[in-house]
């Protein structure tokens, strides 16, 4: 524990106490020690009295452990800057030969010090601090830090214990880095105390700015926290649920119920929902007009893709809903010791990559969301070669109508370059696809994954399809939570996926190979980032 004075000199608690002990005249507290007491009170949000009590307790316990002083009393007057340490002895009879010289003193010996003492009184013998050892100071500091931590924890628990799991808005005060300068986390100002959010509690790739306010979930209060007891999170699913509820009146009033959320923070989320009113489409209500609501929420999480899925109590139907927009041809529920927990799903060959997602994120989310122990995905050809006898799907997934309408929408003359939506019908206008595709076009000189978008859509074709007036009408405007911070606009891949021809020689080889599950001619990717 250190404090820096105006002179620039940094003084520790131990150093100041040594200075104090060597300059004792009337057991006066020196200025560095007084300053440290004030600083501890300020930074830990404790009163001066609480810090002084911790120092008193630390000194008493250190003396008892170090010098076997069983009965020691410390009195500190902070206002006058005076500290007194005394050893206490019970006055006993001179005839008592078995007295404990650490706790007791014969009457005759006591009267030599104070003639007014009688049997049963307590003799207070001052202990000079000028000869205090560094070992005793180290013990005192360790106990003092422990007592401060315990006192601070009690204060924090009293204020925040009922708020664990709640969402708060708070300002980033400082950044915490390792010796190499790498990010460890951030210190968050909670007004009456501080909170801490580690790097692992952030969305993937997320960086916070000092001085800005963000939304956090109070995850837990740790008694033995090395920094601050309140642990905060932005990767917790409760923050996503809070934003969905705040931005969707139908969730807030109970018409729509969020059944389950699975997240890969900063990458992708899947939310299972159900409507208690047949007239209310839960997916459309959450997405909002032209997807504005969900786009704003996505920006809060560094562009995280958010999929809304129709929940169904039938485990199989729920799985088929979660796999959308990919088409499920058939399935085979494995009959083994884990009956009804594993399933094999058959989809079109060119949609396998889409089902798996980048680095398998999508299939993991699907499995966790729907409760299947494992979900294995095959093309018809692979299923046949593996002698998998599957049952052809005899029902349509919920939410299929809007997807079927847009799945084969062509925006170029090349029949192999197709864009299809994953949203519900009447949520996003057909014109949006043209506008977003144009926004993704980049200069030929830039070597970025977005080059693929230029191969898909020719500028001249876009200009023919959309007039300047129409473009102005369909510009999506993201509705962001009033207190949220967005580092960049929502990615277009929140709205659609693209199918590219893997045989196109202009594509880099690793752009296809890294996403290819089977050597098919055509592969479907979750987003432009996946290419």
Curated annotation (Swiss-Prot):
<dbReference type="InterPro" id="IPR036555">
    <property type="entry name" value="NusA_N_sf"/>
</dbReference>
<feature type="compositionally biased region" description="Basic and acidic residues">
    <location>
        <begin position="463"/>
        <end position="475"/>
    </location>
</feature>
<feature type="region of interest" description="Disordered">
    <location>
        <begin position="463"/>
        <end position="531"/>
    </location>
</feature>
<dbReference type="InterPro" id="IPR010213">
    <property type="entry name" value="Tscrpt_termination_fac_NusA"/>
</dbReference>
<keyword id="KW-0804">Transcription</keyword>
<dbReference type="Pfam" id="PF13184">
    <property type="entry name" value="KH_5"/>
</dbReference>
<dbReference type="GO" id="GO:0031564">
    <property type="term" value="P:transcription antitermination"/>
</dbReference>
<keyword id="KW-0806">Transcription termination</keyword>
<dbReference type="InterPro" id="IPR009019">
    <property type="entry name" value="KH_sf_prok-type"/>
</dbReference>
<dbReference type="GO" id="GO:0003700">
    <property type="term" value="F:DNA-binding transcription factor activity"/>
</dbReference>
<dbReference type="InterPro" id="IPR015946">
    <property type="entry name" value="KH_dom-like_a/b"/>
</dbReference>
<protein>
    <recommendedName>
        <fullName>Transcription termination/antitermination protein NusA</fullName>
    </recommendedName>
</protein>
<dbReference type="InterPro" id="IPR012340">
    <property type="entry name" value="NA-bd_OB-fold"/>
</dbReference>
<keyword id="KW-0963">Cytoplasm</keyword>
<keyword id="KW-0694">RNA-binding</keyword>
<feature type="compositionally biased region" description="Basic and acidic residues">
    <location>
        <begin position="502"/>
        <end position="512"/>
    </location>
</feature>
<comment type="similarity">
    <text>Belongs to the NusA family.</text>
</comment>
<dbReference type="InterPro" id="IPR013735">
    <property type="entry name" value="TF_NusA_N"/>
</dbReference>
<dbReference type="InterPro" id="IPR030842">
    <property type="entry name" value="NusA_bac"/>
</dbReference>
<dbReference type="Pfam" id="PF08529">
    <property type="entry name" value="NusA_N"/>
</dbReference>
<dbReference type="GO" id="GO:0005829">
    <property type="term" value="C:cytosol"/>
</dbReference>
<feature type="compositionally biased region" description="Polar residues">
    <location>
        <begin position="513"/>
        <end position="531"/>
    </location>
</feature>
<dbReference type="GO" id="GO:0003723">
    <property type="term" value="F:RNA binding"/>
</dbReference>
<feature type="compositionally biased region" description="Basic residues">
    <location>
        <begin position="476"/>
        <end position="490"/>
    </location>
</feature>
<keyword id="KW-0805">Transcription regulation</keyword>
<dbReference type="InterPro" id="IPR004087">
    <property type="entry name" value="KH_dom"/>
</dbReference>
<dbReference type="InterPro" id="IPR025249">
    <property type="entry name" value="KH_dom_NusA-like"/>
</dbReference>
<keyword id="KW-0889">Transcription antitermination</keyword>
<feature type="domain" description="KH">
    <location>
        <begin position="340"/>
        <end position="410"/>
    </location>
</feature>
<comment type="function">
    <text>Participates in both transcription termination and antitermination.</text>
</comment>
<dbReference type="InterPro" id="IPR003029">
    <property type="entry name" value="S1_domain"/>
</dbReference>
<comment type="subunit">
    <text>Monomer. Binds directly to the core enzyme of the DNA-dependent RNA polymerase and to nascent RNA.</text>
</comment>
<dbReference type="GO" id="GO:0006353">
    <property type="term" value="P:DNA-templated transcription termination"/>
</dbReference>
<feature type="domain" description="S1 motif">
    <location>
        <begin position="165"/>
        <end position="235"/>
    </location>
</feature>
């Amino acid at each position: 524990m250190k404090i820096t004075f105006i002179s620039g000199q940094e003084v520790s608690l131990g150093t100041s106490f040594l200075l104090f002990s060597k300059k004792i005249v009337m057991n006066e507290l020196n200025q560095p020690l007084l300053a440290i007491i004030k600083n501890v009170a300020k930074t830990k949000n404790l009163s001066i009295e609480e810090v002084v009590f911790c120092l008193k307790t630390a000194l008493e316990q250190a003396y008892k452990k170090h010098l076997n002083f069983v009965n020691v009393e410390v009195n500190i007057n902070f206002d006058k800057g005076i500290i007194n340490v005394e050893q206490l002895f019970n006055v006993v009879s001179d005839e008592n030969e078995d007295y404990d010289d650490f706790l007791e003193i014969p009457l005759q010996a006591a009267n030599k010090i104070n003639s007014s003492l009688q049997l049963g009184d307590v003799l207070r013998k001052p202990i000079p601090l000028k000869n205090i050892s560094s070992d005793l100071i180290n013990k005192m500091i360790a106990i003092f830090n422990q007592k401060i931590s315990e006192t601070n924890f009690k204060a924090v628990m009293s204020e925040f214990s009922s708020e664990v799991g709640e969402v708060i808005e708070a300002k980033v005060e400082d950044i915490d880095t390792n010796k190499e300068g790498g990010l460890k986390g951030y210190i968050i100002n909670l007004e009456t105390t501080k909170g801490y959010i580690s790097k692992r509690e952030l969305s993937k790739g997320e960086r916070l700015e000092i001085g800005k306010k963000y939304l956090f979930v109070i995850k837990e209060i740790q008694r033995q926290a090395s920094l601050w007891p309140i642990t905060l999170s932005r990767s917790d699913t409760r923050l996503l649920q809070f934003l969905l509820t705040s931005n969707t009146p139908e969730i807030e009033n109970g018409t729509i119920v969020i059944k389950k959320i699975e997240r890969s923070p900063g990458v992708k989320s899947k939310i299972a929902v159900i409507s208690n009113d047949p007239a209310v489409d839960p997916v459309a209500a959450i997405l909002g007009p032209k997807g504005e609501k969900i786009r704003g929420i996505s920006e809060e999480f560094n562009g995280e893709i958010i999929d809304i899925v129709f929940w169904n109590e039938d485990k199989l139907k729920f799985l088929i809903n979660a796999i959308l927009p990919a088409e499920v041809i058939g399935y085979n529920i494995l009959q083994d010791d884990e009956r009804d927990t594993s399933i094999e799903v058959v989809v079109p060959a060119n949609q396998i990559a889409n089902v798996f997602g980048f680095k398998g994120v999508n299939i993991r989310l699907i499995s966790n969301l729907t409760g299947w122990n494992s979900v294995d995905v095959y093309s018809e050809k692979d299923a046949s070669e593996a002698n998998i006898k599957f049952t052809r799907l005899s029902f349509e997934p919920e939410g299929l109508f809007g997807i079927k309408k847009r799945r084969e929408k062509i925006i170029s003359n090349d029949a192999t370059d197709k864009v299809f939506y994953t949203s519900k019908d009447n949520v996003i206008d057909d014109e949006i696809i043209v506008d977003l595709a144009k926004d993704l076009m980049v200069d030929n000189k830039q070597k970025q994954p977005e080059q693929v978008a230029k191969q898909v859509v020719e500028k001249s074709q876009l200009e023919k399809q959309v007039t300047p007036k129409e473009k102005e009408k369909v510009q999506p405007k993201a509705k962001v939570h009033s207190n949220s911070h967005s580092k960049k606009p929502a990615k277009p891949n929140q709205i659609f996926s693209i199918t590219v021809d893997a045989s196109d020689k202009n594509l880099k080889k690793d752009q296809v190979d890294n996403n290819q599950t089977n050597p098919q001619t055509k592969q479907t990717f979750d987003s432009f980032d996946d290419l």
